[in-house]
């Protein structure tokens, strides 16, 4: 539902209650409560008794700031004050939308160089319900034109659908280079992600001794190197300058 900050929260709480009583509890609803203040979001969720989810404006703001600040942004703080950190089961995550694109009243576009990393941050982690922006997938024409990211997004969507499962372990220990791993499900291979907002770098991360000797490659093609997991289950996963890499087992 759009622009719910202009609608009384008491009404919204009871309205969604009535809708779900008629349509069933699995009738999904989320709202655009356009407010980046952490406490305001916490209070609103309490007022509506968490009967529907909210778009994560705070995370979008963090992604926008990260894209404009470049290497001056501390990537270890990318989820600070966000809904997905405070209320992961009620956060609808997004990178950009029709309000934040260039030329709009709430313009706060995530710069193109950072969009692949931003989408990896919402698509390949265990928390939040991610949304793709039409303009990012298909591109935007006209005065405020933007290239499309369809090829990159298709690869990230494949990784989410087939690889992004299991325990998540974060390696947020460097302001300019972060990473995380997903252990995979019983039938799938693990996944590793590295992001840099500065120079080329690498991140030592544990995949597990069961995968010792296996070779990993970057499915985004941003790093041509491969990574071999050592006998203790660790690998040194590189990332190019101001880039993102998504690593999985090479067939």
Predicted region positions:
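Active-site-proximal helices and loops of the catalytic beta/alpha 8
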Residues: 3-251
